[in-house]
């Protein structure tokens, strides 16, 4: 029987030492982990360098497996303070129940909270453009009522969490402030790609073709 179950996770490279293994993991997922789509399994995640990546539990699509709490603890043990439980401010029963569960897990484990947005466009008025685009591709998501898909400012995010009524003031502030930790990325000038010299080192061949 086919099992197409999949879960989301957010991986962010802090440094070049994090980016390269992350790219390697994605390549490995395409080469040996492809089942319906490229898949990164738990051993591959746990092989990534703990100090050079940030990891968050992303959206509701992370919590798909019955043993996901145990998986979350394993990932938190590996990535330490670079691992976050992501809360979002959607006005839906599903997100409310998930945030309640996340807070329980946060209280038990001490894994820090971080705020995330499920942004599919920038401004609220762009929603129709996205709908038209999905329609042109024959795609339809019937259960999007109450889901915020714009890219809001901080004041709007806070107001949405407050209306949701799950997180306390201090928890909302903690989750929002923790997003600032992602600003501490390695900056560098120039390109890191290997030099491209063309087939056999002769660009004239490519130009002639």
Residue ranges, per PLM feature:
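Phosphodiester-processing cores and adjacent nucleic acid-binding clamps
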Residues: 1-209
């Amino acid at each position: 029987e086919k099992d197409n179950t999949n879960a989301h996770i957010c991986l962010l490279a802090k440094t070049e030492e994090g980016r390269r293994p992350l790219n390697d993991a994605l390549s490995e997922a395409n080469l040996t982990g492809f089942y319906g789509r490229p898949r990164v399994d738990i051993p591959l995640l746990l092989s990534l360098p703990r100090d050079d990546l940030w990891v968050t539990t992303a959206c509701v699509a992370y919590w798909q497996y019955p043993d996901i709490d145990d998986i979350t603890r394993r990932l938190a043990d590996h990535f330490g303070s670079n691992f976050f439980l992501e809360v979002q401010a959607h006005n839906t029963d599903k997100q409310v129940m998930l945030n309640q569960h996340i807070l329980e897990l946060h209280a038990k484990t001490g894994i820090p909270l971080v705020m995330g947005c499920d942004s599919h466009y920038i401004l609220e008025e762009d929603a129709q453009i996205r709908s038209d685009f999905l329609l042109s591709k024959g795609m339809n998501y019937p259960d999007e009522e109450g889901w915020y898909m714009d890219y809001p400012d901080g004041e709007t995010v806070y107001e949405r969490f407050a209306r949701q009524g799950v997180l306390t003031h201090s928890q909302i502030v903690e989750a929002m402030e923790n997003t600032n930790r992602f600003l501490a990325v390695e900056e560098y000038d120039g390109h890191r790609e290997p030099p491209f010299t063309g087939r056999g080192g002769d660009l004239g061949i490519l130009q002639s073709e």
